[in-house]
Amino acid sequence: MKRLVLACALLALLAGCRETPADHLQRARDAVFEKRPDEALVEYRKAVDLLRRDDTPQSMVLRARALKGAADVYWLEQRKVKEAVSVYKELLAQCPESPEALEARIILAELLRVHYRDLRGAIDQLTAALQRNPPQSAELHYQVAKLYFELGDYAQSELEANRLAERFSTSAYVDDALFLRAQAIHMMEGRRQEASKAYADLRARFPDSELAAHATVEMGRLRAEAGENEKAIELWVEALKSHPDPALVQDYISRARRRIADTTPGAIGERAAAFGHGPPPRPPARAPRTSVEAVGGTAEEASRDHGD
């Protein structure tokens, strides 16, 4: 009887000492807080290993947290991009519908764009994130539009920017989207007039936006490209009032004025010449009459040479 009681007590003790995935998760979080990332990674991996064969809803929740925690340690604490990308992808494969997966897609998109220049991969991740209708959808739409612009797919960039402006008309990203739309149109051949209208639309809808001055500068550039330097200067002078880089705008103005000067015939537009107030014209030089004058002698010396 005593042996049976002892055995039961031992089993109870062993059961109480058994570590759970939640225990490892807590230890991992403590290690992160205490700046011990290597130890945190060990604990996160132990939690994942214990949960690997358990597909219950609670297990999936813990697994997603463990994988997200490990990926964040690789990226945020150790700056190990390759390892972070691998674990974020593991999270997406095992727990695609978890809240952590949404965050992982957004982070993964940035890593793919910045560190691998995989712009299409980044677009895929953001597009998948948008299917979840996250609260930051307007921002993600804008990021997608910018990525298409970086790819040189200006038509798709214009389309994505339009979608943002239509679906999220009260978002803080609408003026950014309209400016990007105008830039995309500007980059497409044969659509200069449409681009100018798009910039003007931004100025009309958001006159107090910091992008309004940038739109004015771009309208001036379009005028200059069309050879309308005077109109370009008018727009640039207007932009000087609020543009964050007035030196850049002044440079545009100076270059346009030089182009005007280089293409204007001499004396045209000069007030003194137009009203006859300039210096009198120089008389034409008299051709030398003798060989003495030809080499620089005076008329008097020439006459003496000939015995005059």
Predicted segments, located by residue:
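Acidic, polar-rich low-complexity tracts and alpha-helical solenoid repeat scaffolds
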Residues: L4-L6, G16-D308
